């Protein structure tokens, strides 16, 4: 018989120890991975609820199982809040992840062998935008576009490639691009050849919700996003659209279920509903504004310390440090910073001479540290510590000094107070 006082600690000590150690790691390390964030206890409460028990294949009011009257309310709340938050008139909250959302879009609108244009992974794109190692790159004929010598998207190249290859879809969005995307220009290019414009705004969804970054929803045929990252919700995906094309919406729904998924995760959808409500609060906008300010403040320090920032700056929450001139690899930098309790990720840079497993750069993002309460003063100090380590990458004394500074600032700015 199940009892409400059952717990992991008394039953599975090994698992509980790992979970508790991860809790300590998150509190005692500075998180700078651009795709990571801290979700609220309210979201975690939803994810740990009895909703995890319920199968609900189908959509609200059109389920294949009985007993869905309450989860219908949960999902409809998430749908309506997502539409309001992003100015959409269609939302599908069922995708289990951003990658699943993207695959559902492809499933709904493309046939194997169709041509798509996607941002080159080495220039800041994402695996699911046509990388040859991803299913998207195996199923479709992918033509990559990239950035110019200034580090910005080359729209002239994009237009020329579109005209030459006549793709059925142009994919916008990125995983490591610090500039502003001209969604209107991309739609013009797509319209000129009769292609879909599909935008993956996973990295900037929180900034978009707070009007800190341009919203692609009014311009794209379809928009997807994750619900974590800058949006700070549970790990999951979301599909949005606007324009009233009911035929398109039906195709998208079918692309999710039954096209690429079975039963939705109702406990996660409840977490999404909570996160969307939180994103409508005034303090969320203040938070996102600070995310952008903090990223810019860090860039200023790195430039002053002689580091090469790809694109020369940032207009969102992330940026890349190109370490080629420093004769460092991303792998070395990642490991050295990790020893000082600073977590980043190695990342390829444009024209990277190293393999994706080594790389010549690191990606830095500000959402998580901003969630802790860091402002410009703290992130400038942090950027200085990172520079100290990278300037003296084999000096254990510098590493130990910075680690103590990190532990001190983490204690002053806890994740969960």
UniProtKB/Swiss-Prot annotation:
Its EC number is 2.1.2.1. It comes from the Bacteria. Belongs to the SHMT family. This is Serine hydroxymethyltransferase. GO terms for cellular component: cytosol. Its main location: cytoplasm. It comes from Erwinia tasmaniensis (strain DSM 17950 / CFBP 7177 / CIP 109463 / NCPPB 4357 / Et1/99). The gene is glyA. It catalyses: (6R)-5,10-methylene-5,6,7,8-tetrahydrofolate + glycine + H2O = (6S)-5,6,7,8-tetrahydrofolate + L-serine. Catalyzes the reversible interconversion of serine and glycine with tetrahydrofolate (THF) serving as the one-carbon carrier. This reaction serves as the major source of one-carbon groups required for the biosynthesis of purines, thymidylate, methionine, and other important biomolecules. Also exhibits THF-independent aldolase activity toward beta-hydroxyamino acids, producing glycine and aldehydes, via a retro-aldol mechanism. Pfam families: SHMT (PF00464).
């Amino acid at each position: 018989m199940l009892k409400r006082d059952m717990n992991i600690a008394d039953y599975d000590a090994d698992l509980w120890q790992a979970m508790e150690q991860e809790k300590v790691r998150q509190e005692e390390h500075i998180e700078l991975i651009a795709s990571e964030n801290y979700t609220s206890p309210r979201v975690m409460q939803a994810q740990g609820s009895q909703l995890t028990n319920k199968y609900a294949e189908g959509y609200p009011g059109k389920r294949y199982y009985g007993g869905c009257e309450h989860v219908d309310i949960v999902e409809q709340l998430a749908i309506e809040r997502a539409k309001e938050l992003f100015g959409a008139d269609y939302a599908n909250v069922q995708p289990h992840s951003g990658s699943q959302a993207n695959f559902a879009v492809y499933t709904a609108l493309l046939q194997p062998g169709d041509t798509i244009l996607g941002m080159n992974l080495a220039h800041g794109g994402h695996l699911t935008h046509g990388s040859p190692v991803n299913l998207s790159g195996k199923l479709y004929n992918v033509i990559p576009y990239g950035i110019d010598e200034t580090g910005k998207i080359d729209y002239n190249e994009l237009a020329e490639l579109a005209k030459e290859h006549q793709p059925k879809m142009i994919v916008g969005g990125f995983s490591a691009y610090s500039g502003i995307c001209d969604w209107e220009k991309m739609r013009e290019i797509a319209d000129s050849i009769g292609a879909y414009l599909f935008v993956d705004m996973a990295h900037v969804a929180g900034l978009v919700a707070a009007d800190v970054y341009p919203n692609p929803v009014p311009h794209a045929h379809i928009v997807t996003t994750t619900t974590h990252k800058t949006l700070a919700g549970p790990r999951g995906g979301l599909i949005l659209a606007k324009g009233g094309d009911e035929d398109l919406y039906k195709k998208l729904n079918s692309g999710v279920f039954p096209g690429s998924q079975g039963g939705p995760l109702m406990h996660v959808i409840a977490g999404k509903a909570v996160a969307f409500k939180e994103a409508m609060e005034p303090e969320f906008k203040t938070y996102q504004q600070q995310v952008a300010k903090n990223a810019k403040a860090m860039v200023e320090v790195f430039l002053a310390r002689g580091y090469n920032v790809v694109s020369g700056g940032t207009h969102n929450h992330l940026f890349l440090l190109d370490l080629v001139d420093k004769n460092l690899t991303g792998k070395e930098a990642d490991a050295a910073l990790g020893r000082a309790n600073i977590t980043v990720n190695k990342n390829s840079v444009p024209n990277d001479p190293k393999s994706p497993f080594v790389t010549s750069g690191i990606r830095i993002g500000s959402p998580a540290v901003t969630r802790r309460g860091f402002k410009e003063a703290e992130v400038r100090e942090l950027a200085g510590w990172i520079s100290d380590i990278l300037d003296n990458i084999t000096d254990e004394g510098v590493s130990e000094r910075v680690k103590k500074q990190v532990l001190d600032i983490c204690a002053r700015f806890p994740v969960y107070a």
